[in-house]
């Protein structure tokens, strides 16, 4: 996959696949376990200081993709290269060093925090792992400085997670991820569990911290309006497959794939006149089973443009300009 960019290439994902074995019903004692392919043949690149938005319906493989990149689930095929090094070939000791540069912010802010630890201990935990030489006073100083940076008062350092709102808990999670100054943050739907008014605050905080610290972000969400606000490039996924990938301008203003068009039509427009006159593309049917996906194009069972060729051939993920990639026979 070719994308012209003068910035440093941090992450390269090539033909990544993640599969899980699914146990059959207990009555079928001799039946072989089925295979669920959560991520199939996904490729993209991430450059220094860039934000890649990953969007799609629930169950499309967004979070599994993120967890495979950081090593929380094992990839079954493909390559994950971090600064040119193959992550899948790394030992546990090498992974520990890599995770200094790659941190993650989780979807449920309260569930991701240890209820038995105060927030000072939570934020300081990465420092104790990666910088054990620091004194208690130095750790406290760094923690309080990071709390200020994410919008938390330092005098709250001894309080516990249950004493904070959802938005504040997410700020604690952000502080914990940033305390060791990583190069990349994977944000797994960081605002989906928050009120709309708080979502904008957290997204703007991430943008501000990205600019200040030179971070690269993988921002996973199902809200295309939020993704547009923060992303430089956008990857659209469906049933574990990459459907479309391009810059935010290309994906939002020159949408190619029928699935992306359907997602875009569901995004509300603040202008009442435009909202009243816009066309809505409704998807037919339900999301197919990932254990038994459709042949050919996985989206064909819900696509209004699908024909018999779509059932016979899986569309290649290709581009005409080396930046805007689409997996659709009707676009090629």
From Swiss-Prot:
It is a peripheral membrane protein. Part of the ABC transporter complex OppABCDF involved in the uptake of oligopeptides. Probably responsible for energy coupling to the transport system. Its EC number is 7.4.2.6. NCBIfam families: oligo_HPY, PRK15079.1. It comes from the Bacteria. Belongs to the ABC transporter superfamily. Pfam families: ABC_tran, oligo_HPY. Gene3D superfamilies: P-loop containing nucleotide triphosphate hydrolases (3.40.50.300). It is an enzyme of class 7 (translocase). It comes from Haemophilus influenzae (strain ATCC 51907 / DSM 11121 / KW20 / Rd). It catalyses: a [peptide](out) + ATP + H2O = a [peptide](in) + ADP + phosphate + H(+). Keywords: ATP-binding, Cell inner membrane, Cell membrane, Membrane, Nucleotide-binding, Peptide transport, Protein transport, Translocase, Transport. GO terms for molecular function: ATP binding; ATP hydrolysis activity. Disulfide bonds: none annotated. The complex is composed of two ATP-binding proteins (OppD and OppF), two transmembrane proteins (OppB and OppC) and a solute-binding protein (OppA). GO terms for biological process: peptide transport; protein transport; transmembrane transport. ATP binds at residues 56-63. InterPro entries: AAA+_ATPase (IPR003593), ABC_transp_ATP-bind (IPR050319), ABC_transporter-like_ATP-bd (IPR003439), ABC_transporter-like_CS (IPR017871), Oligopep_ABC_C (IPR013563), P-loop_NTPase (IPR027417). SMART domains: AAA. Its main location: membrane. It is found in: Cell inner membrane. The keyword rRNA-binding does not apply. This is Oligopeptide transport ATP-binding protein OppF. Residues 23-264 form the ABC transporter domain. GO terms for cellular component: plasma membrane.
């Amino acid at each position: 996959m070719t994308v012209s960019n003068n910035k440093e290439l941090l992450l390269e994902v090539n033909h990544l696949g993640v599969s899980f074995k699914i146990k059959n019903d207990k009555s079928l004692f001799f039946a072989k376990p089925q295979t669920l392919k959560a991520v199939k043949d996904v490729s993209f690149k991430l450059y220094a200081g860039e934000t890649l938005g990953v969007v799609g319906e629930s169950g499309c493989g967004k979070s599994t993709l993120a967890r495979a990149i950081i090593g929380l689930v094992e990839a079954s095929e493909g390559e994950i290269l971090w600064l040119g090094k193959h992550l899948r070939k790394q030992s546990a000791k090498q992974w520990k060093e890599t995770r200094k540069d790659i941190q993650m912010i989780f979807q449920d802010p309260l569930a991701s925090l240890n209820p038995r630890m105060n927030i000072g201990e939570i934020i300081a935990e990465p420092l104790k792992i990666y910088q054990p030489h620091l004194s208690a006073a130095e750790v406290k100083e760094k923690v309080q400085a990071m709390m200020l940076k994410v919008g938390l008062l330092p005098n709250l350092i001894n309080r516990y997670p249950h004493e904070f709102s959802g938005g504040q808990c997410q700020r604690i999670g952000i502080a914990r991820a940033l305390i060791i100054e990583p190069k990349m943050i994977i944000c797994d739907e960081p605002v989906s569990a928050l009120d709309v008014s708080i979502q904008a605050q957290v997204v703007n905080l991430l943008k501000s911290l990205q600019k200040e610290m030179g971070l690269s972000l993988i921002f996973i969400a199902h809200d295309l309006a939020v993704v547009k606000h923060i992303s430089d490039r956008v990857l659209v996924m469906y049933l574990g497959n990459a459907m479309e990938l391009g810059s935010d301008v290309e994906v939002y203003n020159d949408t190619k794939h029928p699935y992306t068009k359907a997602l875009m039509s569901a995004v509300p427009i603040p202008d009442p006149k435009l909202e009243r006159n816009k066309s809505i593309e409704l998807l037919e049917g339900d999301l197919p089973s990932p254990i038994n996906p459709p042949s050919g194009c996985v989206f064909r069972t819900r696509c209004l443009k699908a024909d018999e060729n779509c059932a016979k051939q899986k569309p290649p993920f290709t581009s005409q300009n080396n930046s805007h990639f689409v997996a659709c026979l009707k676009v090629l």
